[in-house]
Amino acid sequence: APLEPVYPGDNATPEQMAQYAADLRRYINMLTRPRY
């Protein structure tokens, strides 16, 4: 199973937040993808 992305913290840069958001979206997609 994919690892859950780690929240970069309240002092994260916009780049870190964007990367986290992208990783989180990919992570959720992997969790919710139907398994055939």
From Swiss-Prot:
Transmembrane segments: none annotated. It is found in: Secreted. The keyword Nuclease does not apply. GO terms for molecular function: hormone activity. Keywords: Amidation, Hormone, Secreted. GO terms for cellular component: extracellular region. Its main location: secreted. Coiled coil: none annotated. The modification Tyrosine amide is found at Y36. Pfam families: Hormone_3 (PF00159). SMART domains: PAH. Hormone secreted by pancreatic cells that acts as a regulator of pancreatic and gastrointestinal functions probably by signaling through the G protein-coupled receptor NPY4R2. Belongs to the NPY family. This is Pancreatic polypeptide. It comes from Macaca mulatta (Rhesus macaque).
